Amino acid sequence: MKKVLLTLAVIVAGLSVTVLDINAQNKSGKTKFQQEMQKWHQDMEEFRARSAERREINELTDSIAGVQAAAAVLNRDFVLEADQVTFKNGNTVFVNSSTTFISVKGNRAVVQISPSNFAAGPNGVGGVTVDGSISGMQQMVDKKGRTTISFNVMGIGINAQIEIYMTPGTNQASATIYPNFNSNTVWIDGNIVPYENSDVFEGMSL
C-alpha cells in the first residue's frame, strides 16, 4: 500500500512540475508575443512619424516651387519643362524635359517638341524648334486658385495660341498648343521653373 501511495505521489509531483513548466512556457510565450507586438506598434508609430515628416517636407518643397513658378510667370521669365507629350491622335510619349519645353523670356517664346531619342529631326535633338514674338498675354485665376496663362506666338516657323494651366500650390503645369493654320493640337505636361534655373537645350529653329 505504501508503495502504491509513494508511486502516486511521484506521479502527482511529476504532473505538477509538468503543469508548472507548461504554465511557465505559456507565460514566456505570451511575454515574447507581447514584446513583439509592442515593438511592431513602436515601429509603426516611427514609420507614421517619418511618413508625416516626409509629407511635410514634400508639401513645403512643392509650395516653394509653386511660389517661384508664379513669380517667374508674372515676370515673363520661365520655362515649362515637359516630361510628357500627347498628340492629336491620342498617342502619349514620355520625353526628356531638357529637350521638350516652352520657354518665355520677355516678349520671346520658344516651343520645342522633341519626342524622339533616335532621330535627329529638323532641330538636331529629335524634333522641331520654333520661336517667335509673344502677343496678347493674359493671366487669369479662377475661384479654385487655378492659374491659366494664354498668349499668341508668331514667328517664321510658328503661328499658334498657347494656353498654360498651373496646378495651385505647386509648379506642376500642363499646356495646350493650338496651331492657327492646322488642327495638329499638342498637349504637354511638366513643371514650370524660373528661366535661370532651367537646364533645357535649345535646338536649331526653323
Each language-model region and where it sits:
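Well-ordered beta-strand positions
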Residues: 72, 103, 110, 165-167
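Bacterial Sec-dependent N-terminal signal peptides
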Residues: 1-31
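Helix-rich interaction surfaces within compact, conserved domain-sized segments
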Residues: 26-37, 137-206
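Mid-length scaffold segments of soluble, non-membrane domains
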Residues: 92-146
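N-terminal leader/targeting segments and the immediate start of mature chains
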Residues: 34-89
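Solvent-exposed coil/turn segments that connect beta secondary-structure elements
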Residues: 83-85, 105-107, 114-116, 154, ...
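Residue-level detector of beta-strand structural context in well-folded domains
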Residues: 69, 100, 162-164
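Short beta-strands and strand-coil junctions in structured, solvent-facing domains, enriched
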Residues: 87, 118, 158-161
